[in-house]
Amino acid sequence: MPASASPSIAGLLLAGGRATRMDGVDKGLQLLDGTPLALHVLSRLSPQVDETLISANRHADRYAELGAPFDARIVADETPDFPGPLAGLLAGMRAARAPLVACSPCDTPYLPADLVARLQAALDAQQADIAMAVTVDAQHVRSPQPTFALLRTSLADDLAARLAAGDRKVRAWYARHKTVEVEFHDERAFYNANSWQELAALARR
């Protein structure tokens, strides 16, 4: 993209959580096959977007180092109490130069290579505010994946108001806006690590 061009989609890596089920470690910095989880995700997400942001509330210098090959910028929550992914999303929406933000957790190393394109196609086709991934397994069970989404940055003020009111649930906030669900049939692409056991399992997949 030429330096003078305006980016159309920002990618946002959500790495600002507390990882309470992993003894509070910084999940994105844990290694899979010798590489930090966050770098696995950045390597898949950044080629799909025009600018890259990393939501990180700890170890900002380390994330800046990981993000340097992608010209990533670091953003932090506006509040210090780790209020959850919506706070990271808000920080990214505020910082983005693009009108759309595509978000992904930092612990999903098999992120689909066509995630953003498919979300954008659905968003445009339905003239929606938010496009959210949904996995469908072999038994046709649908599982929403709300932290894999494409959102309009114009929603930032509403999100800020809901966070100020104490709302923390991602899907509850999505329900306030026109949201389209996009089905993905490759469950493996959305596997993540919420525990040490799941991190070990990722290495075996």
UniProtKB/Swiss-Prot annotation:
Q: Do you know which Pfam families this protein is assigned to?
A: NTP_transf_3
**Its biological purpose:** Transfers a GMP moiety from GTP to Mo-molybdopterin (Mo-MPT) cofactor (Moco or molybdenum cofactor) to form Mo-molybdopterin guanine dinucleotide (Mo-MGD) cofactor.
The processes (GO biological process) annotated in the record are: bis(molybdopterin guanine dinucleotide)molybdenum biosynthetic process
Q: Which top-level enzyme class is recorded in the Swiss-Prot or TrEMBL entry?
A: transferase
- Share the domain note from the entry: The N-terminal domain determines nucleotide recognition and specific binding, while the C-terminal domain determines the specific binding to the target protein.
* Residues annotated as binding Mg(2+): 107
Which cofactors? Mg(2+)
Q: Which reaction does it catalyse?
A: Mo-molybdopterin + GTP + H(+) = Mo-molybdopterin guanine dinucleotide + diphosphate
Q: What is this protein called?
A: Molybdenum cofactor guanylyltransferase
How does this polypeptide assemble, per the annotation?
Monomer.
Q: Which family does it belong to?
A: Belongs to the MobA family.
Identify the EC number(s).
2.7.7.77
Which CDD domains does the record match to this protein?
MobA
Subcellular location per the Swiss-Prot or TrEMBL entry: Cytoplasm
Where does it primarily localize? cytoplasm
- TM region(s), chain numbering: none
Entries under HAMAP family matching the protein:
MobA
Residue positions annotated to bind GTP are 14-16, 27, 77, 107
Keywords in UniProt for this one? Cytoplasm, GTP-binding, Magnesium, Metal-binding, Molybdenum cofactor biosynthesis, Nucleotide-binding, Transferase
Coiled-coil stretches? none
| InterPro entries documented for this protein | MobA-like_NTP_Trfase, Molybde_CF_guanTrfase, Nucleotide-diphossugar_trans
A GO MF term: molybdenum cofactor guanylyltransferase activity
Q: Name one GO cellular component term.
A: cytoplasm
